[in-house]
Amino acid sequence: MIALGGLSSGRGCGSILKFVSWWGSFLATDGEKNSFNIVAIGLVLRGAPREKMDRNRFQKIVFQMTPVQKFLIAPDKFKGSLSARAAAEAMAAGILRVHPDADLDICPIADGGEGFMETLAPGLDARWITCAAVDALGRPIESRYLLAETPQGLTAILEMAETAGLWRITANERNPAQTTTRGTGMQMVHAAQNDGVVRIILGLGGSATHDGGAGMAAALGHLFITENGVNDDPRASNLGEIRAIDFGHRVDLPEIIAACDVDNPLLGARGATAVFSGQKGASVLDQPFLENALAHLVAVSEGHSAADIPGAGAAGGLGFGLLHFAGASLVSGFDLLSSLLGLEARIAAADHILTGEGSLDYQSLSGKGPVGLARMAQTLGIPVTAFCGVTDDEARGSGLFHALHALTDSGLPLDRLIAEASPLLTDAVAKANFFKP
């Protein structure tokens, strides 16, 4: 610390000294090597013009003088602008701009919606399988899923958004009463027919559907009986016509694990209709019909216990359908992904963690990926800095993050934030302060 005594007094010097003390406390566990770093920083500051020694330059100098830092970069998608992998690459570019020698562990995360398979594929050394299916409106498509060898055996990994996701239909086509999960069921049948498959993991989220999983169940072989015969295309618009369900014709299935990041039941004030149907195109006037359709499905199938399970309302009630018609278990999408990717060990090996998503707000605090990651890191004592498109006071005040940076803080218009999300995210990371205050 003797070297710091040579710093001339004057405006701005106090903040620099405070900043050095922050870095000193950050390094204080590493003995003589850190004492050397503090002295070296002081020597640099002695010869540096104060007016040019801004925080970003100081951070770069510190990074260059200290042992290589290891960063775990693990964002979720920035919906509408960046996939999880694209967000991770933008963050990595920001770190490398300041610290070219940083050790980076890039690990995009997902909650079960769009990008679930893409996130898992590299870490599991999985292979892609294609199969015929239909989209949320019943139109033929070519879809794909993953096959991967895991400690539990050969596993098929699907995401319902691959067939029945909102991304596959236009805004004008959104009509939850006319959508189907049949394509998801077709994928499940195809996956189950692969030799040696012992389980199917299915990510829920990003759905355009609201059929309670009835379309999926019909594809699996369940018969939905009406006064006019068998309805092989059940949708919310015609669920009320069902008089009975024949459960005796379902195809054989391996273990089914459904991954989701919501804990909503199927019905009621927190159910699929009340919470999620609006984003799929339903108006307030449509909601009573949609709620009654799901309630009728529960009654005619005697599925009351399944309807109350947390997560039953996921993906327009597909959570319920998987529980009741496929014998699935529902698990946290983050917990499942964490297990498959060995996330806890990767967190423990990092000096600092970067995460984020498009909207990091009060809803995220219910357990979405970045928050689950931050909570795990908090128990291990690893600091987490989050970046997002937009945030709120609840997320900022959660105490989970070393710092939280929102792109909207820049004051730029929304269209530019979306169009230039990647370079703006890179700039935000490069300018961020990763020192402990």
Segments and roles (model prediction):
Residues 2-7:
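Extreme N-terminal basic, low-complexity initiation segments
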Residues 8, 48-51:
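Short linear/disordered segments characteristic of secreted peptide precursors
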Residues 18, 33-34, 52-56, 60-61:
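Polybasic, lysine-rich low-complexity intrinsically disordered segments
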Residues 20, 30-32, 42, 46-49:
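Short, low-complexity, charge-dense intrinsically disordered segments
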Residues 66-204, 208-437:
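N-terminal loops that bind phosphate or other acidic moieties
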